[in-house]
Amino acid sequence: MLALTLSSCSAGGGLEAAQAGSAGTQEFVSGDLRVHEIPPAERREPVRFAGVTERGDAVSSDDFVDQVLVVNFWYAACGPCIVEAPLLEEVWQTHQGNDVAFLGVNIYDQPSTAESFAADNGVSYPSVIDIVDKSVSQAFAAVTPIQATPTTLVLDRQGRVAARIIGELQSASILSALVADALQETT
């Protein structure tokens, strides 16, 4: 496990609320970066989700069959989300066209705010707006713990969570290595 210093955000009623346990307990990460790769034999079932992007386009897990998918949970007022946005875009630009896709999951903002964030921070990949029923967040939370915002997941070509980064991404090379590992796996 790799540990680095960071800060993470918490939006009341956001993804963390979707993660709340039966006793109402919630898990948060603050003060460190956690990277966890999951060996193929230990991965859970593929994540099935469907939502609508900030531009009104329908998107679902079916759109990413046989691709490595990077999913980033974020919102516009989250300081670490702002800091890591250029790093995520750098990794996206590096791997774009190599059976890799990127998808944001905005857990708090209206579509216009998400579009402004993308324009202001140079983010070119789409984001699902998941503020109404939290169905996308809940689909992922059913398969893997999402304890803080931002959280970044790498899904293998089968749609299973292969790696999880909890907290602010500190270096593009961390995510790039996780994507490369997932790309090298045989299905």
Model-identified regions with their sequence ranges:
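N-terminal targeting signals for export/organelle localization
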Residues: M1-A50, T187
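Short, ordered coil/turn segments that flank beta-strands lining enzyme active or ligand-binding pockets
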Residues: S7, E54-R55, R157
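A short beta-strand-turn-helix
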Residues: P39-L69
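Extracytoplasmic
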Residues: R44-P46, F64-D66, G97-V100, S112, ...
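Short active-site neighborhood of thiol/selenol oxidoreductases, capturing the structured segment around
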Residues: V59-I82, L88, F102
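Structural microenvironment flanking redox-active thiols in thiol-disulfide oxidoreductases
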Residues: I82-G122, D133-A139
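Thiol/disulfide oxidoreductase modules built on the thioredoxin-like
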Residues: A119-V123, I131-Q184
